[in-house]
């Protein structure tokens, strides 16, 4: 924990007596320069390394800090989960105000992970109603260091369209003029911001009869976006109880309280426990890495199947983005993507690069072989400069069994592969010849470009063998 956080904790009487049976320490930190955003920290007696940052609701006008905040501390601490209640500032039309508070809270927890016995790769965010919108905004828009590893969303506001979400939240978050800006409304309607692999897994909990925040255009819309993106997501819809029940039990209006806790507990127990000492593997690529056409690509895409083969001693991340090129002058360059920034921030120990299929399109290859070579060299140079000093594997594209989208297998074989081989030798990178090794024409989608789930498993096996050879 840095000196600034420590001094703030001491100034504010940080070491507070135990507030509940499972809480070892409770203290409050200043979370904004003006002192109006606060982070109340509940550290458990028996930490597991997991943590949750909580964003109470209140329509971006006030905060329900009790039943959507502090009352949850014992529930989480009893499971060994550190719990942090965020008192965020109201936007009053400036959405950057609560967002900056939420980003700061996430960074504080990760910056202090060693002192607070937290695994910085196991930090989730939780939000209720408008706080659910804030939590889902962090999940979909934050950079790597502030993005949670999982999300817990209770009856969340997802749409910023006043007619589809919660009008008060929309006007308070975006302002009277902002709500008239369709581009801004779409940007912060978070079902439209879900990204494959980058948006963390989530659980959504809501009531079917919620008339304040309609489930279908909010929580259900987020679930649908997650499912369509191939991301892991769970949803529980309770028959009645409306909106805003939080931690209230049956005696206080929520008859499904115990069932809800059981559902949430089971989901939390199902989450993987990241190994802090795992070898970190970043899979960089296009739609073939992304898992285009493979339902639930986060489970059946080649990076996910590579994870299964490598086991718990490795942590494999999918940084594939569909349609992207290696060429910086291609139609959609990979190195302009958030996924590229995230792959670097991940500080990988191993990097698998498989880019070139889209470069082999007629209009892209018109940029020339030298552009392809220079762009790949630039990517290699950037990765070699990372403090983690990753081992880099350069892969040739798999065969283009058809010329869909003008992708030329001849360009791949006669132009790209020699460049990749020369760069591998020059930069002392490993080379994986997927083009020769991948002979599974019957394991392709009908476009002849993308492997199906069985083909992705074969790809994972080829790459696994190369990694194991070291």
Which functions belong to the PLM regions below?
Residues 64-66, 71-73, 84-120, 251-257:
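Catalytic nucleophile-loop/oxyanion-hole region of alpha/beta-hydrolase
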Residues 104-169, 185, 190:
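Primarily recognizes the serine-hydrolase "nucleophile elbow" in alpha/beta-hydrolase
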Residues 203-210:
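Short beta-strand/loop motif that positions the catalytic acidic residue
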Residues 211-218:
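Conserved alpha/beta-hydrolase "acid-adjacent" motif
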Residues 220-275, 446-449, 453-457, 470:
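C-terminal catalytic histidine-bearing segment of alpha/beta-hydrolase fold enzymes
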Residues 242-253, 294, 398-470:
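Catalytic His-Asp segment of secreted/periplasmic serine-dependent ester chemistry enzymes
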Residues 278-282, 288-374, 411:
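Conserved SGNH/GDSL esterase-like catalytic core that processes O-acyl groups on lipids
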Residues 354-360, 381-414, 435:
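Active-site segments of SGNH/GDSL-like serine hydrolases
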């Amino acid at each position: 924990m840095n000196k600034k956080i420590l001094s703030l904790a001491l100034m504010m009487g940080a070491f507070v007596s135990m507030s509940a049976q499972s809480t070892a320490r409770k203290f409050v930190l200043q979370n904004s320069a003006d002192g109006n955003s606060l982070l109340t920290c509940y550290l458990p007696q028996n930490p597991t390394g997991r943590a949750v940052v909580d964003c109470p609701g209140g329509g971006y006008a006030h905060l329900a800090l009790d039943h959507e905040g502090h009352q949850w501390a014992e529930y989480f601490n009893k499971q060994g989960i550190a719990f942090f209640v965020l008192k965020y500032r109201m936007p009053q039309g400036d959405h950057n105000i609560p967002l900056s508070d939420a980003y700061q809270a996430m960074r504080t927890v990760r910056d202090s992970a060693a002192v607070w016995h937290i695994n910085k790769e196991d930090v989730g965010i939780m939000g209720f109603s408008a706080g659910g919108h804030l939590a889902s905004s962090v999940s979909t828009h934050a950079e790597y260091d502030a993005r949670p590893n999982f999300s817990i969303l209770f009856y969340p506001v997802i749409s910023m369209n006043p007619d589809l979400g919660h009008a008060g939240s929309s006007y308070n978050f975006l302002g009277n003029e902002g709500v008239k800006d369709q581009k801004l409304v779409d940007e912060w309607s978070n079902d439209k911001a879900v990204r494959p692999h980058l948006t963390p897994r989530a659980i959504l909990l809501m009531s079917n009869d919620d008339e304040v925040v309609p489930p279908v255009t909010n929580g259900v819309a987020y679930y649908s976006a997650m499912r369509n993106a191939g991301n892991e997501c769970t949803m529980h819809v309770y028959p009645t109880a409306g909106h805003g029940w939080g931690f209230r039990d049956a005696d206080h209006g929520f008859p499904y309280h115990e069932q809800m806790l059981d559902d949430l507990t089971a989901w939390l127990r199902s989450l993987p426990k990241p190994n802090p000492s795992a070898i970190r593997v970043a899979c960089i690529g296009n739609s073939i890495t992304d898992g285009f056409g493979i339902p639930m690509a986060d489970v059946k895409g080649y990076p996910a199947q590579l994870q299964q083969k490598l086991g718990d001693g490795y942590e494999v991340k999918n940084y594939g983005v569909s349609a992207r090129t290696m060429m910086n002058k291609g139609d959609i360059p990979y190195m302009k993507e958030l996924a590229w920034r995230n792959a670097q921030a991940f500080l990988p120990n191993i990097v698998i690069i498989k880019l070139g299929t889209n470069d082999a399109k007629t209009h892209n290859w018109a940029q020339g072989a030298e552009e392809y070579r220079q762009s790949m060299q630039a990517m290699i140079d950037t990765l070699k400069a990372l403090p983690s000093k990753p081992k880099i594997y350069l892969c040739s594209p798999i065969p283009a069994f058809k010329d869909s989208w003008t992708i030329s297998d001849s360009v791949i074989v006669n132009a790209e592969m020699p460049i990749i081989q020369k760069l591998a030798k020059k930069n002392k990178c490993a080379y994986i010849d997927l083009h020769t090794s991948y002979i599974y024409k019957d394991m392709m989608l009908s476009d002849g470009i993308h492997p199906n789930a069985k083909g992705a498993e074969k790809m994972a096996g080829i790459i696994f063998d190369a990694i194991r050879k070291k």
